[in-house]
């Protein structure tokens, strides 16, 4: 499509993780992390970019490229061909993977809390996080989500419990 679409719903529908960077540096780092998550959990991973992040420019720290050996292709029709008989068996695997991804989301380093003991908290992700930081500065605490699906439910509950008022600042459907 030539116009912007809100792809957040696809992650939940497909039951695969989604990462949302807020700047150029995070785009690079989250791309690498997406591959790591994909290999660890044996699933694809979405990297959600909004127009504002895609068109932004900022300095990026580069590391030395890593050589990664290609794994040999292993034909596995039961895993990759979703005919009804295979899909029924794979559904259990998908649900177990989502449970493990939800656990991972709670400790994932790209989900973080920035707390200075303020009464107001802001939950945000992507470019909306940077907009909130620019507008509100140190007047509020932040829960910055880098992995937006699955969401770190306990982290969000704990963050909300520590604040009198919590705002969610996000980009909405275009």
Question: Predicted regions span which residues?
Answer:
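Flexible, low-complexity linker and terminal segments
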Residues: 21-174
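Flexible glycine/proline-rich, aromatic-decorated loop/lid segments
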Residues: 1-13
């Amino acid at each position: 499509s030539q116009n912007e679409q809100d792809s957040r719903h696809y992650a939940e529908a497909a039951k695969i993780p989604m990462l949302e960077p807020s700047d150029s540096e995070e785009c690079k780092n989250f791309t690498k992390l997406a591959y790591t998550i994909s290999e660890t959990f044996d699933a694809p991973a979405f990297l959600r970019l909004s127009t504002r992040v895609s068109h932004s420019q900022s300095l990026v720290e580069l590391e030395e490229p890593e050589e990664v050996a290609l794994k040999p292709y292993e034909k596995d029709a039961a895993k990759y061909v979703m005919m009804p008989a295979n899909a029924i068996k794979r559904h259990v695997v998908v649900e177990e993977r989502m449970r493990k991804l939800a656990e991972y989301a709670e400790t994932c380093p790209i989900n973080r809390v920035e707390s200075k003991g303020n009464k107001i908290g802001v939950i945000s992700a992507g470019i909306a996080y940077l907009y909130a930081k620019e507008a509100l500065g140190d007047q509020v605490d932040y829960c910055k989500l880098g992995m937006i699906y699955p969401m770190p439910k306990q982290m969000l509950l704990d963050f909300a419990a520590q604040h009198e008022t919590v705002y969610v600042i996000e980009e909405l459907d275009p």
